[in-house]
UniProtKB/Swiss-Prot annotation:
SMART domains: Solute_trans_a. Residues 483-502 have a biased composition (Polar residues). This is Transmembrane protein 184C. It comes from the Eukaryota. PANTHER family: ORGANIC SOLUTE TRANSPORTER-RELATED (PTHR23423). It comes from Mus musculus (Mouse). Keywords: Membrane, Transmembrane, Transmembrane helix. Coiled coil: none annotated. Residues 373-388, 503-525 have a biased composition (Low complexity).
């Protein structure tokens, strides 16, 4: 008997099941909260977490309903997977803030992990934009190179601009990804400093770790948002069909408002507005500041959930498609292998840059290049391959919603350069393109070449001795044939050979015409 999750009608019962589960949770949680509220001494702290709990109960169903609708209509995994991750931001923030508000002693631990999710959200928003552009423009790098040069915007307007094309795309991705690395590192550092009693959250001063970590996080976050903004400015017209402004504001406001209001509350503590004179049921003024931050976030997330519901709506993805199983959809939602691939690729690329190695490009038949390509990889595929193929939602969950890599063309010169860079200098001398290399030329082509030599006397000197640079690619093809004698001739070399044959044929035709004309003149009395 097949699993119920794999039946085609799972979309019918999953939504009523969620409603039933949430109703049961309400019936159990509300009486417990009321009983605890009456048992405890009713003070400012108790009232704050009770009011925040009401907003939490209103926020969770709005967010979960939007997530569930995307899973039910999971027809475009490359776009919907990052959207689902962004939608999870609201319930994670709400639950985390409420738990920290109820139990202030563990606030430092839950709040730091909550802030880590900020970087994850910004990263997924970048994935969403790049995947959409790659689906619409399979050769995104070439499309960027054709656009006018974009200068930096404030506050980096004085810096040299990034070259349009691969450099701009890579650096914008790198700017976003660096925050996903910096933020977890600072989070672990904050936990260690708290254990060592040198963190001192909410207190501005050069004697604690909190001040330095806040400055580092702020700089990293600002640069990530700057790269997102620059990326949007360059591709504003191309992104207009998905209305990115509202989506960008939803992500930016949640991240920036939560961060800067924490800084503002810390300044109130520093200025003495929040002081030890009145801490209500909290242990210190810093604990009051943390509790105030968590309380405000619980209220803000209710409005953020409503904004996310309309901004990241599931309705554009409601259409007939191959049905996937419930199990695959839920596993795809939690799959984070693309992050591992992106970070690994970035580490390799930075390592190659530091060692002075050139960028490595993938051949069209490279088995390592598939739908699991990382965010930072710019794969080199044949221009004739057409548009990127979107994986079906009915397949295995590992293929759901991974980042799509843009295509870029391959030239003989680039292949030649990559191969020669990997060959020792001693062997390069033996394989110098200037040396004579024996090539088996068909008899018919040899006849054409011999005829061409006979006609050379009628060609002007400047045309008879062309510039050697015109045949640079042919010399490189000769070297590649010497390196890979068993490999079939590339498409470019076939084109060059065809052009040579055509040129020889034209010259022979001219020679024949000249001979005929001479014959006519000789027979004319």
């Amino acid at each position: 008997m097949p699993c119920a999750c794999n039946r085609s009608n799972w979309r019918r019962w999953i939504r009523p099941l969620l409603v039933l589960f949430y109703a049961t949770t309400i019936l159990v949680a509300v009486p417990i909260c009321i009983w605890k509220f009456q048992k405890m001494k009713v003070g400012m702290h108790t009232k704050s977490w009770f009011i925040a709990g009401i907003f939490l109960l209103l926020t969770i169903p709005v967010s979960l309903w939007g997530i569930l609708q995307h899973l039910v209509h999971y027809t475009q995994p490359e776009l919907q997977k990052p959207i689902i991750r962004i939608l999870w931001m609201v319930p994670i923030y709400s639950v985390d803030s409420w738990v920290a508000l109820v139990y202030p002693k563990i606030a430092i631990y839950v709040d730091t992990w909550r802030e880590c999710y900020e970087a994850y959200v910004i990263y997924n928003f970048m994935i969403f934009l790049t995947n959409y552009l790659t689906i619409r423009f399979p050769n995104l790098i070439l499309h960027l190179e054709a656009k006018d040069q974009q200068n930096h915007i404030l506050p980096l307007c004085c810096c040299p601009p990034w070259a349009m094309g691969e450099m701009l795309l890579f650096r914008c991705k790198l700017g976003v990804l660096q925050y996903t690395v910096v933020r977890p590192i600072t989070t672990v550092t904050a936990l260690v400093c708290e254990i060592l009693d040198v963190y001192d959250e909410g207190n501005f001063g050069f004697s604690n770790a909190w001040t330095y970590l806040v400055i580092l996080n702020n700089l990293s976050q600002l640069f990530a948002m700057y790269c997102l903004l620059l990326f949007y400015k360059v591709l504003k017209e191309e992104l207009s069909p998905i209305q990115p402004v509202g989506k960008f504001l939803c992500v930016k406001l949640v991240v920036f408002v939560s961060f800067w209001q924490a800084v503002l509350i810390a300044l109130l503590v520093k200025l003495g507005v929040i002081s030890e004179k009145r801490t209500w049921e909290w242990q210190s003024a810093e604990a009051v500041a943390t509790g105030l931050q968590d309380f405000i976030i619980c209220i803000e997330m209710f409005f953020a959930a409503i904004a996310h519901h309309y901004t990241f709506s599931y309705k554009p993805y409601v259409h007939e498609a191959e049905e996937g199983s419930c199990f695959d959809s839920f596993l795809a939602m939690w799959d984070v292998s693309d992050i591992r691939d992106d970070i690994s690729e970035q580490v390799r690329r930075v390592g190659r840059t530091m060692r002075g190695y050139p960028k490595k490009k993938c051949f069209p038949g490279d088995p390592d290049h598939n739908e699991h390509s990382s965010l930072l990889s710019s794969s080199s595929q044949d221009l004739t391959s057409g548009s990127s193929k979107v994986p079906s939602p009915g397949g295995l969950y590992q293929g759901f919603g991974h980042t799509i890599s843009s295509q870029s063309p391959i030239s003989i010169a680039s292949i030649y350069e990559e191969i020669m860079n990997d060959i020792p200098e001693e062997q390069q001398k033996l394989l110098n393109p200037g040396q004579d290399v024996t090539i088996n030329i068909p008899e018919e082509q040899q006849k054409l070449i011999d005829k061409r030599k006979d006609v050379m006397i009628d060609i002007p000197e400047q045309n008879a001795i062309p510039d050697n640079s015109q045949y640079q690619d042919q010399e490189q093809i000769v070297t590649l044939q010497a390196l890979f004698p068993s490999t079939e001739t590339s498409e470019n070399s076939m084109i060059d050979t065809s052009e040579s044959q055509q040129e020889s044929s034209d010259l022979c035709t001219e020679s024949s015409d000249s001979s005929t004309e001479s014959s006519d003149l000789s027979t004319d009395p």
